[in-house]
Amino acid sequence: MMTHEALIEIVGLVRLFGATRVLDGVSLTVGSGEAVALLGPNGSGKSTLLKIVATLLRPTRGTARVLGHDCVREAEAVRAGLGLIAHGAHVYDDLTALENLRFWTTLSGLPADRERLTAALGDVALERHAGIRVRTFSVGMKRRLALARLSLARPRVLLLDEPFAGLDQRGRKWLQGRLETFKASGGAVLMATHSFGRELEIADRLAILAGGRVALDTPRAALGADDVQRLYVAHTEEAAL
């Protein structure tokens, strides 16, 4: 059995919001060259888990480590090796596409020369829109602009929240190819989703989050589409009882 260097290590994570226990002892590992699809209904804690790993939220208890760095005590080191694409485009409507990337790279301490930024726009077929204000873009174009950051940052770990939501066909095809290449280079991918689409085609493992816990963690290759849906329904309904 192939083993992978652990790039994401989550152990016993608990997160309370008031009296509500959103995460209840979650443990999960994502290795080098692996993509894990974190599948669960709305409100199951998927986004909360990603925010903790991304250093945007502190756990109540438990630990999360990225590239060996603790997500609370070594947040800056974690962010240096991590790429995050949250749900929604998160771009600036009053800036052009090129200005959006220049602003983001400057904040991230990355090179911001025009040739490099234009090449990143070309990766997502937006180079002809470089000088156009983003307020005129479609939802899919805005999502592709957000994804262009992946061509600039070169992280070792990717966190994706509903990665294919809002993408047009060109964007979906580009992202799927980009993620396959990223895995082949030894990167680790953790994707949160409630759909049964392309995320599951890319995933090496499937983790079902229900009732604040990992109800199932299993290799994806052994499961057909009907198996995934059956297991998802069974575990989420059980957690709701």
Model region roles, listed by residue range:
Residues 62-70, 78:
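Conserved ABC transporter NBD signature motif
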Residues 193-194:
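H-loop/switch region of ABC-family ATPase nucleotide-binding domains
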